[in-house]
């Protein structure tokens, strides 16, 4: 499966992580290549969308412009990959620089979005405080339970959130649905926008990617 590893060009650690991620994908059937990420400095080169009303991104816009522009840059990377998925007319994987491939892709069948790192995602320090984490079954399953849900008062409210966007696969159908929602309602923080109201979310175990490197936390600026 064509796999795009997001990194920031010129950021030494980001480039090192990206190279390690691609190396981990060797002989895995994840056909990985670098994908230069958008930054606040290059954001104006891409189509601009308004943020959804009463959402997470709107809070950042009023409270911290730097974080807002960084979050918007991160989201734009997803949009570019979704468009690439439709252009290629085949499933692709979105993988962040600090992810590591741990097993071979075996052409799992999924509908729209498949979380590729479900077990390690919930073990991230950011979720240490989260209670009632989901019990995960072997194989591909619908993402029907999560303690992470959308709390803001808009059309996404009460949907289940993807537990970060470290590694996921998406089909052209899933990409089209997310882009349609974007055009209609606007954008939000990436792991708030990819939710169960917007797209059919599924997970797979054993997972294909995990975290072995320290999180650079680049979604909050760098």
Please describe what each predicted stretch is.
Residues 1-95, 99-222:
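An acidic/histidine-cluster motif and surrounding catalytic segment
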């Amino acid at each position: 499966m064509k796999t795009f590893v997001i990194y920031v060009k010129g950021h030494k650690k980001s480039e090192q992580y990206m190279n390690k991620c691609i190396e981990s994908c060797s002989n895995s059937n994840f056909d990985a290549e670098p994908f230069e990420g958008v930054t606040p400095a290059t954001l104006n080169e891409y189509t601009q969308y308004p943020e959804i009303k009463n959402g997470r991104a709107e809070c950042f816009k009023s409270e911290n412009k730097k974080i807002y522009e960084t979050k918007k840059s991160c989201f734009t990377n997803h949009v570019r990959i979704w468009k690439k998925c439709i252009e290629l007319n085949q499933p692709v994987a979105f993988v962040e620089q600090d992810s590591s491939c741990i097993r071979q892709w075996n052409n799992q069948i999924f509908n729209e979005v498949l979380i590729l790192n479900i077990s390690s995602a919930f073990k991230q320090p950011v979720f240490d405080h989260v209670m009632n984490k989901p019990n995960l079954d072997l194989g591909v399953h619908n993402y029907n339970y999560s303690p992470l849900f959308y709390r803001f008062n808009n059309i996404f409210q009460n949907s289940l959130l993807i537990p970060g966007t470290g590694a996921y696969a998406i089909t052209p159908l899933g990409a089209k649905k997310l882009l349609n929602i974007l055009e209609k309602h606007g954008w939000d923080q990436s792991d708030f926008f990819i939710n169960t109201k917007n797209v059919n979310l599924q997970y797979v175990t054993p997972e294909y990617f995990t975290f072995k490197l320290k999180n650079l936390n680049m979604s909050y600026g760098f």
